[in-house]
Amino acid sequence: MDKISIIVPVLNSKEHLNRIIMGLLKQTINDMEIIIVDSGSSDSTLDMCKDWSFLDNRIKVYETKDSVIDFGLKKATGKYILFLDNLNLNDNTMLEKMQKALIQNNADISIYNSNCSIITNYLVCDSINIINDFDGCLWNKLFKKNLFNSYNNIEDVFKTALKKAVRISLFV
């Protein structure tokens, strides 16, 4: 399978960092890179990140004051992109499932949602409201990296209200 680049923006995240990284390292896929981008932590977050990078060579640590999302995308070498915040990674097969869903369905985006399952190539959910349920949030989605090639400042697309139409067009 192709590599997944996982972009983890951090800022004073020492309380959650170990849980996040441990959850990633327990995933059933190994072909991944974990790109941690610190945007100016004033606590021990950056030191913790560097310690993790010495323990596992798939973990890369960067510092920037610029857009952490765009910075992470520029550093990513994988075919697929996952943005991660404080998501609980209780399912050790989450990345594997998301990647398989992308490949099997020739999709651009795979959305992880515990309320959905794929049954014989049909997506079955409790409810779907494309504007509210799938609006703008980066954190539970696996993207094909080439989806971002036509956007210069992807962080702005997902943060500003004026870009809502662009966000929706990505999912429709």
Task: Cite the ranges covered by each PLM segment.
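N-proximal low-complexity "stem/linker" segments adjacent to membrane-targeting elements
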Residues: 1-23
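Short, acidic, metal-binding catalytic loop of nucleotide-sugar glycosyltransferases
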Residues: 22-31
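A conserved acidic beta->alpha catalytic loop
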Residues: 38-47
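Glycine-rich, basic loop-to-helix element that forms the pyrophosphate-binding segment
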Residues: 63-76
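Short aromatic/hydrophobic "clamp" motif used to bind/position activated sugar donors
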Residues: 81
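The conserved acidic donor/metal-binding loop of glycosyltransferases
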Residues: 85-89
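Conserved donor NDP-sugar-binding/catalytic core segment of glycosyltransferases
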Residues: 93-121
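Conserved nucleotide-sugar donor-binding catalytic segment
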Residues: 127-172
